[in-house]
């Protein structure tokens, strides 16, 4: 399988949203097209936000977002946050996600990040092992998540 890992292109919003259907199948409905396009343009124009995709024969089969956050500690080195990691179910367990995460980490290291953090909502043994094999350690820090009361 010849897969290309690259930054997403502006005209690939629809393909990304199709892929995201496998991320959180019970997600809230999306807003109208004009709102989506506004958010999409905001994401694409922010140099701190990097959306990487795995492309196989013109199809987006995996994606993740890496946000690089400027920082005034740790020698003023930035840190990274990875979110929305998804591989299409038909392409899981084939090394696609591993290549994608590796690409995101190399990008972060190339931008002098002193660490990259990731939270996973899935706690299955396979998912946790996937992230550990990709270089993440689960026992260095404790993660907390707050959500609005209305959610």
Residue ranges and their predicted role:
Residues 10, 18-77, 83, 101-102:
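Acetyl-CoA-dependent GNAT
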């Amino acid at each position: 399988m010849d897969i290309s890992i690259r930054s997403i292109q502006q005209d690939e919003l629809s393909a990304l949203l199709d892929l995201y259907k496998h991320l959180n199948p019970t997600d809230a409905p999306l807003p109208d097209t004009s709102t989506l396009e506004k958010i999409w343009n905001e994401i694409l124009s922010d140099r701190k936000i990097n959306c990487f995709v795995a492309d196989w024969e013109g199809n987006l089969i995996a994606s993740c977002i890496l946000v690089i956050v400027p920082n005034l500690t740790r020698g003023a080195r930035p840190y990274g946050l990875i979110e929305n990691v998804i591989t299409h179910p038909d392409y899981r367990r084939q090394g696609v996600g591993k290549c994608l995460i590796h690409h995101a980490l190399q990008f972060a290291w190339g931008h002098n990040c002193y660490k990259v953090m990731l939270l996973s909502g899935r706690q299955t043994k396979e998912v946790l092992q996937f992230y550990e094999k990709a270089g993440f350690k689960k026992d260095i820090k404790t993660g907390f998540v707050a959500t609005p009361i209305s959610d």
